[in-house]
């Protein structure tokens, strides 16, 4: 999978501040996704490993005693129309593959608006042969999710 991220969101994931990825729709299975960072970066420059998918509606019930958490969850649901939060188990920084490189070497490449599946594509082959892992990795544990951690970034 290739997921699209704004540069500010990418930086929050890279720094370890952001521990959940919120989306309107998302598969209910662990995902390894390459990260495409939008303008001004315009490049694939990381890998994110997403674990368990949480329904925000379930969190509303679970955290109902914490009014601040309920307010944040409702905002994510009503303002941004998010339905799910995926645990960011791990982030791996990589070298960059620029948009120009992708357009030049992968016929018909268009930067994703949200996400695209890569299984069996030329794009996946190009990414796998050109992306190099760096030393930077960030890992998170989700043994206990506190109310103060939900819907904050």
Which residues are covered by each model-predicted region?
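Short coil-to-beta transition motif at edge beta-strands of beta-rich domains
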Residues: 25-35
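Contiguous surface segments at macromolecular interaction interfaces
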Residues: 1-26, 42-45, 53-153
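Short polar/acidic secondary-structure junctions
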Residues: 38-40
């Amino acid at each position: 999978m290739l997921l699209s991220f704004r540069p500010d969101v990418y930086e929050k994931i890279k720094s370890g501040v952001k521990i959940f990825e919120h989306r309107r729709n998302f598969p209910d299975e662990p995902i390894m996704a390459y990260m495409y960072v939008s303008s001004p970066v315009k490049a694939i420059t990381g890998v994110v490993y997403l674990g368990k998918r949480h329904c925000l509606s379930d969190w509303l019930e679970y955290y109902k005693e914490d009014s601040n958490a309920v307010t944040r969850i409702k905002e994510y649901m009503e303002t941004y129309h998010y339905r799910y939060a995926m645990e960011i188990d791990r982030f791996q920084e990589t070298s960059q593959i620029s948009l120009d490189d992708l357009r030049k070497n992968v016929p018909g490449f268009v930067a994703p608006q949200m996400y695209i599946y890569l299984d069996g594509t030329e794009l996946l082959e190009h990414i796998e042969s050109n992306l190099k892992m760096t030393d930077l990795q960030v890992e998170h544990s989700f043994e206990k999710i506190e109310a103060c951690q939900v819907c904050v970034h």
